Amino acid sequence: MYSLARPFLFSLDAERAHALALRSIDTAYRTGTTALLARRPVPLPTPAFGLMFPNPVGLGAGLDKNGEHIDALFALGFGFVEIGTVTPRAQEGNPKPRMFRLPEYQAVINRMGFNNLGVDALVANVQRARRTGGLLGINIGKNKDTSNEEATSDYRYCMERVYPLADYITVNISSPNTAGLRELQEEQSLRRLISDLRETQEALSAQHGKRVPMLVKVAPDLNDRDIDAAARVLADLAVDGVIATNTTVTRTLVANHPLAAEAGGLSGAPLLGQSTLVLRRLRARLPESIPLIGVGGINSGADAVAKMAAGASLVQCYSGLVYRGPQLIGECVNAIRRRREAPSGGAVSPL
């Protein structure tokens, strides 16, 4: 079905096509025709962060920024859906156009800039959702006009608002589309921010009588020294998990494309190699008690297996859905299932 719709969607501006695709998924859900878009995968229960995921394939943050399509997305067969990034106050994001397809490379460049309706709107949407079929992650960020020195207050506010509703919370400090945000990944800044948020997490756990895991999402553009420093901080502070990775600002593999000079984060197939290297290095540097989610460049079941081989417990798709459609979900689940059933038992590949 998606192969028939794709030529029309690709004739539209990328952001307009994005909105239309979400409306179509909603329509299919309301009319009970989601099965025409994707066959729901057979469950593949997967433990991580003290939770049990129906299957290890999730939706990465950014597709449903405001939590307006949760039930329709679960109906496609995701084991978990991550909504956001959400900020304390609504913001429009960067000027349009701000999303670009690179079909020759099965890639996307975006500079959305955390456009969202604000955390209160997201909370209202989550409260209305039925949420059957999977676990819900909520990705939080800071407003663009909040300085890095004051960033903790934005993250804390969002965490307090979404904590009762989230199955896990992701702290996004790695988007390239908010000026200065990635500076929060520097060792001392990271330690201050995550230390404060761990204290908030523990206080909220006592207040609500449940512990919601807190994950940190990192960039693929960190050098080995920065990765090692981040791993030390995240291990010292005992975060619940790490998502590797966000989009990249490098253009090496798409340098000849006419859109390569567009500002923003590059995602899709060209990101697979670098994001998986970061994932593998983090797995080698972090204790086994901190699971990883692998994301970046997954366009096939084999790509998902590569993430698992590099040390991921779960994987997420986003740009791959633009090119492959919802069938990618089941393909990834089935490929991971075959890997689990293999005699090797799915050992992590060495550095």
Swiss-Prot record:
Domain of life from the UniProt record: Bacteria
Entries under PROSITE patterns matching the protein: DHODEHASE_1 (PS00911), DHODEHASE_2 (PS00912)
Annotated FMN binding sites: 61-65, 85, 139, 172, 217, 245, 268, 297, 318-319
Any GO CC annotation of this UniProt entry: plasma membrane
Catalyses which reaction(s): (S)-dihydroorotate + a quinone = orotate + a quinol
Catalytic residues as annotated in Swiss-Prot or TrEMBL: 175
Enzyme class: oxidoreductase
Pathway of action: Pyrimidine metabolism; UMP biosynthesis via de novo pathway; orotate from (S)-dihydroorotate (quinone route): step 1/1
TM region positions: none
EC number(s) on file: 1.3.5.2
Positions annotated to bind substrate: 65, 110-114, 172, 177, 246-247
Major location category of this protein: membrane
Cofactor binding comment, as recorded: Binds 1 FMN per subunit.
GO BP annotations listed: 'de novo' pyrimidine nucleobase biosynthetic process; 'de novo' UMP biosynthetic process
Compartmental location: Cell membrane
Cofactor(s) listed: FMN
MF annotations from Gene Ontology: dihydroorotate dehydrogenase (quinone) activity
Role of this protein: Catalyzes the conversion of dihydroorotate to orotate with quinone as electron acceptor.
UniProt record similarity statement: Belongs to the dihydroorotate dehydrogenase family. Type 2 subfamily.
Subunit structure: Monomer.
NCBIfam families named in the record: PRK05286.1-1 (NF003644), PRK05286.1-2 (NF003645), PRK05286.1-4 (NF003646), PRK05286.2-5 (NF003652), pyrD_sub2 (TIGR01036)
UniProt-recorded name of the protein: Dihydroorotate dehydrogenase (quinone)
Organism: Xanthomonas axonopodis pv. citri (strain 306)
Species lineage: Bacteria, Pseudomonadati, Pseudomonadota, Gammaproteobacteria, Lysobacterales
Protein's gene: pyrD
